[in-house]
Curated annotation (Swiss-Prot):
Pfam families: AKAP7_NLS (PF10469), MJ1316 (PF04457), zf-CCCH_4 (PF18044). GO terms for molecular function: zinc ion binding. InterPro entries: AKAP7-like_phosphoesterase, Cyclic_Pdiesterase, Leng9, MJ1316, Znf-CCCH_4, Znf_CCCH. It comes from the Eukaryota. A zinc finger (C3H1-type) spans 8-35. SUPFAM superfamilies: LigT-like. This is Leukocyte receptor cluster member 9. Residues 212-247 are annotated as: Disordered. Keywords: Metal-binding, Zinc, Zinc-finger. SMART domains: ZnF_C3H1. It comes from Mus musculus (Mouse).
Length: 485
């Protein structure tokens, strides 16, 4: 029985090979006695198969701008100029915030489809021609490759020397007219896009006339979706921010007369409907007051802050009271334990800033020192904490008494006057965060039933700190300590 079992498991020898007439050779599925072992076959991608997706230049731009660990000053951009060929400029020299159509002469801006490569400290990290991506690790047949964070954490062993592949036609700027459209279609799926800007593209009509077509805001470079402006968690120093997207306006009909100041540009469908009743668009523009209709335009999207000015909690009595409140929270809701703010990281955020690079950090420290030492700051000498407040089932915090609203507004105005980029959220007030649950998590904080000891819950206001926000899941980094006296 055992012999029959062994014989059933082992495949039978090819009888045609024994007779010397097996026409399959090495491809035969039956074993050939004495034949060399076949070499392992490496599967190659079939011709015409779809290549792995390569993250676009828009994704790289967004990553450089919004990742706190990346310094935009370390990057440079290689792009195709219509007349000069491929040029390379520092990343910070480009204007990434305004629509291309709104920029005037002398402002450096480039559409997304003209970008050829990115360099990080002189090394090529993203190249369209060679499908190199050391920012996200995309575009590799073998799967995810090394990323920019791997290189930052591990050193040079993750880097491979890559040379940018530049066609001869691009080196001299010859034959670029048709190249722009082809590259735009290849990367954007048929729709040329700019670098997150409202680009104006020229299209030829019949008869040789040229008309301008607005493509609208490029959705591929929108700010990462994070907490909205009404979320009070935005002032804890680590929360990402989001403002509503700017709405698109209807294209207006052309009005020949400009002498009447109250004439209003109406949507084309509305103007046509009015003209059918015997009135022209110009006449109806005078009848309809602009104030009748509500303004649908919303504020532009706020940039994500990278730094913040904060008051650190240093009093041991206040820290002990916060720990007691957190322990009470864990007893009634054990699932909230992982979302508690450590006692050594307790702080109140006063100002949110958007800074890029060590140079702006040093300038912000000097500007903050001047703003604090200037008279009229209205800073209270001591803060008291008693009541706990739940903000949207995601943030448990304690509000200070007296409030820091006046001091925060004064600092915002003074730092803006110094030329710093301040992220303003007027609906938010400085508060002490005890626990914070990220949005999208199923856990909800319960209603607070604990009150801090008013005698122990005190914090003198003598120093402010300039801090850099950490990555997701990491704490912030204090940079500069500035005394209020």
């Amino acid at each position: 029985m055992e012999a029959s079992a062994d014989s059933s498991e082992a495949p039978a020898v090819c009888r045609f090979f024994l007779e010397g007439r097996c026409r399959f050779g090495a491809r035969c599925r039956q074993p050939h006695p004495g034949a060399p072992a076949p070499s392992p076959v490496v599967t190659q991608p079939e011709a015409g198969s779809k290549k792995p997706a390569l993250r676009t230049a828009a994704d790289v731009i967004r990553r450089i701008r919004w990742d706190p660990r990346l310094d935009p000053a370390d990057f440079s951009v290689g792009y195709t100029d219509r007349f000069l060929g491929v040029q390379e400029e520092p990343f910070c020299a480009f204007c990434w915030d305004e629509p291309l159509a709104a920029l005037g002469p002398g402002v450096l801006a480039v559409p997304q489809h003209r970008i050829r490569y990115f360099r990080f400290r002189g090394r090529l990290v993203w190249d369209r021609a060679s499908r190199t991506d050391l920012i996200f690790g995309s575009g590799s047949v073998a799967g995810r490759g090394p990323t920019i964070l791997d290189a930052l954490d591990g050193g040079d062993e993750h880097w491979t020397e890559v040379t940018a592949e530049i066609p001869d036609t691009e080196k001299t700027g010859v034959g670029l007219e048709g190249l722009d459209t082809q590259d735009a279609l290849a990367e954007a799926g048929g729709n040329p896009t700019g670098t997150g800007l409202d680009s104006g593209l020229e299209t030829h009509e019949e008869g040789g006339a040229i008309k301008e077509t607005r493509t609208g805001l490029d959705s591929s470079l929108e700010t990462p979706e994070v907490d909205g402006p009404t979320k009070e968690t935005g002032l804890n120093g680590t929360t990402e921010l989001e403002m509503p997207d700017p709405s698109m306006n209807f294209s207006g009909v052309k009005i020949s007369s400009v002498e009447e100041p109250r004439a209003t540009l109406l949507p084309q469908w509305q103007a046509q409907g009015m003209e059918t009743k015997g009135l022209s668009a110009e006449e109806m523009g005078n009848v309809w007051d602009p104030g009748v209709w509500p303004d649908d335009r919303r504020a532009p999207r706020q940039p994500r802050p990278t730094h913040f000015v904060a008051l650190m909690v240093t009093e041991s009595g206040l820290r002990a009271e916060v720990v007691k409140a957190q322990e009470h929270l864990v007893r009634i809701a054990p699932s909230c334990a992982e979302f508690l703010v450590p006692a050594q990281a307790l702080h109140l955020t006063v100002v949110l800033l958007r800074l890029t690079g060590p140079g702006e950090e040093a300038a912000a420290a000097r500007a903050l020192r001047r703003a604090i030492l200037k008279p009229g700051l209205q800073a209270p000498s001591q803060l008291q904490f008693r009541d706990l407040v739940l903000l949207g089932h995601h943030v448990l915090c304690a509000t200070p008494s007296p409030t820091l609203t006046g001091m925060a507004q004064t600092l915002n105005q003074r730092l803006e006057a110094e030329g710093l980029r301040v992220v303003l959220l007027p609906e938010l007030q400085p508060h002490l965060t005890l626990a914070k649950v990220p949005h999208g998590t199923q856990v909800c904080l319960p209603k607070p039933e604990y009150t801090l000891n008013q005698e122990l819950g005190r914090q003198p206001l003598s120093k402010l700190w300039l801090c850099r926000m950490g990555r997701a899941g990491h704490s912030y980094l204090p940079l500069v300590e500035i005394s209020l006296k």
